[in-house]
Amino acid sequence: MFNKVKVACLILLLGFQGVANAALEIVITEGIDGARPIAIVPFKYQGIGPIPQKISEVIAADLMRSGKFKPVDVAQMPQQPSKDSDINYASWVNKGVEAILVGEVEQQSNGRYLVRYELVDVIRGQITGGQTQMMTNGKLIKNQDHILEARESIISDTGFRRYSHRISDVIYEKLTGEKGAFLTKIAYVIVRDNDDRPYQLVVSDYDGFNEQVLLRSKEPLMSPAWSPDGTKLAYVTFENRQSQIYIQDLYSGKRELVTSYPGINGAPQFSPDGKKLLLVLSKDKTGATEVYLLDLVTRKETRLTRHRSIDTEPSWHPNGQDIVFTSERGGNAQIYKLNLKTGRTQRLSFDGDMNLAGSITPDGKELVMVNRTNGQYHLAKKELATGAFQVLTRTRLDESPSIAPNGSMIIYSTLHNNKQVLALVSMDGRFKARLPVLDGQVKAPAWSPYLQ
């Protein structure tokens, strides 16, 4: 019934302390009819004073955003058990629930907390009454195989959100067989016109919490892109009155100038092995905008496209052998694939009037893009094997889609009330939410890889 795969969730700390409050605040805009019901019961708390963070609320929000789960409203829960032995399996099965998370938080000394939790298959629990027996070395041993996961950990008072995301990852993988992406981060650009340095390069948790400003500038910042190990960001800056590409180390804050040619220096994208960088330059004599490949070790540049039309917005196929890019060589902007070994180019997009900002999902099966049809710019996806096409959003002037490393969600920039905001959509289009910044406009989101 459930894929019982062990999970190892490791966390990368970016070398700076974060604040818990969010500059981005999630607003749900569309529900998740058809998703799997799941119960995330509020954890029982034993301690003096309020609990630093309600773990169950963070987990329920994580799972709902994936589009695959529909957490039961607390007010609709038939009971609120804190451990498996307290669960009335039949009452949950009658509500259509397949799995339930229960747990406890116990305050320790010196700002530490003991957290215990169990993920329970309530259907299996109802069938077996919570106890089964199996033969081991000729002996009949009692087994509780309806408990899919049981863990306990000591965490600090500042670690509740991070640990909640870790539990979400465990649940997601146990119930889907796919790795969760709730411990990841996003990078984006905030523009605050009233600030002395209005352009800010920011990194936060994927849900907008623990925001950290990496760079403030008087000139525009664009196109942040993560290295595959999650330790660096490449981005475009106009600090010296022309476009330049930098790579910045997230641990030390040190940054390195990569290109600063006259004309366009843009759209950096790290290769899957982190050794190369795709970028867009207009440095040749004709001023043509073309896609280049930069070897970060040897600094050798290789021109990949040669066409009189604009070639831009490159991204890597997960196989590391192909790239996709946007080109106007067919008249309107469309998405093409280029094989790095053969140089063969193939058009991938045909639906609507034009298609932009293409990227391939981590499993290599789908193309995500911005599609323009009848003057409307929406996120869409196409199955590469069948050609099946689906529009995912109904927001305005969508741009800059970035896919979660497990392929479950997409973050993008859109227009809401004439203001640029970030938005989330699940890969199946069932769940949608806005992440409006409290001050300023937000654009150019980039989802991190898994953080190890």
UniProtKB/Swiss-Prot annotation:
BP-aspect Gene Ontology terms: cell division; protein import
Q: Which GO terms describe its cellular component?
A: periplasmic space
Query: So which residues are the signal peptide here?
Result: 1-22
Protein localization: Periplasm
Major location, coarse class? periplasm
Member of which family? Belongs to the TolB family.
Q: Which PANTHER family match?
A: PROTEIN TOLB (PTHR36842:SF1), PROTEIN TOLB HOMOLOG (PTHR36842)
Q: What does this protein do?
A: Part of the Tol-Pal system, which plays a role in outer membrane invagination during cell division and is important for maintaining outer membrane integrity.
> Would you tell me the protein name for this molecule?
Tol-Pal system protein TolB
The record lists the organism as Pseudoalteromonas translucida (strain TAC 125)
Taxonomic lineage? Bacteria, Pseudomonadati, Pseudomonadota, Gammaproteobacteria, Alteromonadales
